[in-house]
C-alpha cells in the first residue's frame, strides 16, 4: 500500500472508534493519536486533514468525524518537498529513494512528485483548527532530518497552534530510552484530552 491508499484507512479507523466509543469506553470528542516515522506522518496527516462525518452515508460509521483532538509523535516527515533543506525533493527520491514504493506510481516524474508531495505533506494543511501537537525528534536523524519538525512547528506557531518540540541531542532515527518520551506523550494527552495540569 502507498500513502494515498493508507490515509483513507486511518480516517475509517478513527470513525470506527468514534462510532464504537460507548462500547470501548472512550470519549468520542477526546481522541488522540500517536506514531513514529511513517506513523508520525500519518498522525499529523489526521491532525490537519480530519474530516466531518458524512451525514447521508449509508454506513453509520462513515457518519462519524475522523478529526482528532491531540497528537504526540516521533520524528515524522512533514514536508516531502523541502526535506532536509528548502527545495529538497524526497517524494521517493533522494533521501527516501529506498521507499519509492510508499509514494506509488505518481513518484515517477518531477511534475507529479511536486503535486503529490504537496498533497501528502501535513505542513501545507496546518490551520488555526489544528489540535495540539508534540513531536520528539533526534537532532542527528539522517532519515527524517530534524528540519522537518522545526519547520512544522514554525508553521504551527504561525497559526497559533499549541505545540512542543522535544529535541533529543545526538540521537538518530530512534533511541534506546524512548520510553521516557512516551511518558511525556502521556502527560501531553492528559493535559489536552483529560484537562489535567501540565507537568
Question: Which functions belong to the PLM regions below?
Answer:
Residues 1-22, 183:
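Alpha/beta-hydrolase active-site loop
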Residues 28-30, 66-70, 130-133, 159-164:
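Loop/turn elements at helix/coil->beta-strand transitions in domains of secreted/extracellular proteins
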Residues 12-88:
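Primarily recognizes the serine-hydrolase "nucleophile elbow" in alpha/beta-hydrolase
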Residues 129, 134-137, 141:
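Short beta-strand/loop motif that positions the catalytic acidic residue
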Residues 142-151:
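Conserved alpha/beta-hydrolase "acid-adjacent" motif
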Residues 180-199:
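Catalytic active-site module of serine/aspartate enzymes centered on a nucleophile-bearing elbow/loop
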Residues 47-49, 82-125, 131, 158:
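Mobile cap/lid helix-loop segments that gate and shape the active-site cleft of serine hydrolases
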Residues 168-175:
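Histidine-bearing beta->alpha loop at or near hydrolase active sites
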Amino acid at each position: 500500500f502507498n500513502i494515498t491508499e493508507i490515509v483513507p484507512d486511518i480516517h475509517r479507523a478513527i470513525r470506527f472508534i468514534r462510532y464504537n466509543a460507548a462500547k470501548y469506553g472512550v470519549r468520542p470528542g477526546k481522541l488522540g493519536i500517536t506514531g513514529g516515522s511513517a506513523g508520525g506522518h500519518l498522525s499529523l496527516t489526521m491532525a490537519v486533514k480530519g474530516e466531518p462525518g458524512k451525514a447521508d452515508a449509508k454506513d453509520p460509521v462513515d457518519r462519524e468525524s475522523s478529526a482528532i483532538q491531540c497528537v504526540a509523535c516521533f520524528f515524522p516527515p512533514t514536508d516531502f518537498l523541502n526535506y532536509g533543506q528548502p527545495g529538497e525533493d524526497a517524494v521517493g527520491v533522494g533521501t527516501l529513494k529506498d521507499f519509492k514504493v510508499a509514494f506509488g506510481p505518481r513518484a515517477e516524474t518531477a511534475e507529479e512528485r511536486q503535486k503529490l508531495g504537496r498533497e501528502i505533506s501535513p505542513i501545507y494543511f496546518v490551520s488555526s483548527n489544528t489540535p495540539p501537537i508534540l513531536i520528539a525528534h533526534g537532532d542527528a536523524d539522517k532519515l527524517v532530518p530534524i528540519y522537518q519538525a522545526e519547520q512544522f512547528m514554525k508553521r504551527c506557531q504561525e497559526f497559533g497552534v499549541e505545540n512542543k518540540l522535544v529535541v533529543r541531542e545526538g540521537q538518530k532515527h530512534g533511541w534506546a530510552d524512548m520510553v521516557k518520551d512516551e511518558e511525556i506523550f502521556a502527560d501531553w494527552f492528559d493535559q489536552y484530552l483529560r484537562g489535567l495540569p501540565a507537568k
